Amino acid sequence: MANLEVNPQRYQEQLAEKTERLTEMFSEYNVPELEVYESPEQHYRMRAEFRVWHEGDDMYYVMFNQETKEKYRVDQFPAASRLINDLMPLLTDAMKDNHSLRHKLFQVDFLSTLSGEILVSLLYHRQLGEQWIQDAKALKQQLNDEGFNLNLIGRARKMKIVLDRDYVIEKLDVNGDSYIYQQVENSFTQPNGKVAEKMLEWAVDCTQDSKGDLLELYCGNGNFSLALAQNFERVLATELAKPSVESAQYNIAANKIENVQIIRMSAEDFTVAMEGKREFRRLQQANIDLKSYNCNTIFVDPPRSGMDVDTCKMVQGYERIMYISCNPETLKENLDILSETHDITRFALFDQFPYTHHMEAGVFLERKA
């Protein structure tokens, strides 16, 4: 994790800079006025990773300056949730005098939630044995007795020890409704919980008058699929990463949503299947008949690289397109294609990553008349 200067006095200034930059970037597309969704000014980040430095009897978190590569001590991290900040000193204090817990520990990863759960992964340059398990269980109990709802994982080369479970349960509020999400260690989750809620509300608002079904590519753990299901008859969603697909299935069941179907496929393979160029056994096994779906709307949330040309062409076949982007540069490249057939009717900036140059954008497109 890189150095990050969190300065609440500068928050509005940096947000105004992003607003201006994003508006300027997309001015050629005749976009509507930008809708801007703010982040909390501090304690907004639900996860954080720190290296661990050992100095005599002392042990503390460090980060590295991106430019000079020099390490610096981190006792508190204002970007991270209050839960992470509360736990940071208690965790090192509890491990400092225990040889099996601190020996060759080199990194600590935190995954926290708005719901109050937190998961800690301890990474070691050695194999972990029975003594570590006993001491880690005692550590977990000690911290839970102090009021945390915590789970612990030990990791080493080709080794992962889960004391209880390797995930947290997050609860996000969307227009007064609470959605349950399983978030698994080391899999993608939205880092800024409060902004994630605003993104879901925006997506629900954009699609509230929808007819027919929704197709979603790159659905992750079902983050958007579940909230959007209320606006569609059915939702068909694709995701390639196996842990994310498993989480999505868990989340569908936990939220008692019955009109969402997840398939484990890449967007590229799904494009081939939709065009009827090839049959896929996994679609047959899941008893999914693509022809039975009436998808007028497509939702895409691609990786930083954006969508390839073939996927863009396939996406153009839908009346309405919702595109969430973590990289405005590749969004712009994709819009060069999509804007040939569609107009942008909603345009949003979500400040997922305050005090950095990163911008999360949302566009809603409708087929030209």
Curated annotation (Swiss-Prot):
One cellular-component annotation, GO: cytosol
Lineage: Bacteria, Pseudomonadati, Pseudomonadota, Gammaproteobacteria, Vibrionales
Gene name per UniProt: trmA
Keyword annotations from UniProtKB, A to Z: Methyltransferase, S-adenosyl-L-methionine, Transferase, tRNA processing
Protein name in the entry: tRNA/tmRNA (uracil-C(5))-methyltransferase
GO biological process, one term: tRNA methylation
Binding residues for S-adenosyl-L-methionine: Q190, Y218, N223, E239, D301
NCBIfam families on file: trmA_only (TIGR02143)
UniProt entry tagged with the keyword ATP-binding: no
Homology family: Belongs to the class I-like SAM-binding methyltransferase superfamily. RNA M5U methyltransferase family. TrmA subfamily.
Catalytic activity entry: uridine(54) in tRNA + S-adenosyl-L-methionine = 5-methyluridine(54) in tRNA + S-adenosyl-L-homocysteine + H(+); uridine(341) in tmRNA + S-adenosyl-L-methionine = 5-methyluridine(341) in tmRNA + S-adenosyl-L-homocysteine + H(+)
Active site: C326, E360
Its job: Dual-specificity methyltransferase that catalyzes the formation of 5-methyluridine at position 54 (m5U54) in all tRNAs, and that of position 341 (m5U341) in tmRNA (transfer-mRNA).
Domain of life where this protein originates: Bacteria
Enzyme Commission number(s) from the entry: 2.1.1.-, 2.1.1.35
Class in the EC hierarchy, top level: transferase
Source organism (scientific name): Vibrio atlanticus (strain LGP32)
Regions that span the bilayer: none
GO molecular function, one term: tRNA binding
InterPro entries: MeTrfase_TrmA_AS, MeTrfase_TrmA_CS, SAM-dependent_MTases_sf, TrmA_MeTrfase, U5_MeTrfase_fam
